[in-house]
Amino acid sequence: MSSKFLILLAFCGATLVAAEQLPEKFYGTFDLDHSENFDEYLTAKGYGWFTRKLVTFATFKKVFAKNANKNLFDYSNLTSKKDVFYKNVQIGSKFEGEGLDNTKHEVTFTLKDGHLFEHHKPLEEGESKEETYEYYFDGDFLIQKMSFNNIEGRRFYKRLP
């Protein structure tokens, strides 16, 4: 029985060591600078005119903050309408969090080829739909890319000092 315990302990230890970490370049505060094709993206998702205008004219900041545990990070989505905070996020681990629409979502952050993906699956009825946001850098901008039915929208964020 003790050998099984040691094998399990070794496996768990290897899993913790192998946990993916958020790349250093993502840490910081980013302010929305401009968008491309965002209203078209929201229209494709079926959002009404009023909701689209509220989202389009809202201010947005993204904050990726370091955590005491190097395998975790804190994420904030700060808007003029509502702020959302996710604490102790681990790459690849699902967690339940509140979305900007005030409903519960199953949220997962993953990494692939230097890009960060934020996947939301609504857990309650409402206007919100399942979606994945892709974050990557192009020059000075953190770009948030989203698509639905071949309609792609992009939001461009500038790093704040």
Swiss-Prot record:
GO terms for molecular function: lipid binding. GO terms for cellular component: extracellular region. Residues 1-19 form the signal peptide. It comes from the Eukaryota. PROSITE patterns: FABP. Gene3D superfamilies: 2.40.128.20. Keywords: Lipid-binding, Secreted, Signal, Transport. May play a role in sequestering potentially toxic fatty acids and their peroxidation products, or it may be involved in the maintenance of the impermeable lipid layer of the eggshell. PANTHER family: FATTY ACID-BINDING PROTEIN HOMOLOG 1-RELATED, FATTY ACID-BINDING PROTEIN HOMOLOG 1-RELATED-RELATED. This is Fatty acid-binding protein homolog 2. It comes from Caenorhabditis elegans. The lineage of its organism: Eukaryota, Metazoa, Ecdysozoa, Nematoda, Chromadorea. The gene is lbp-2.
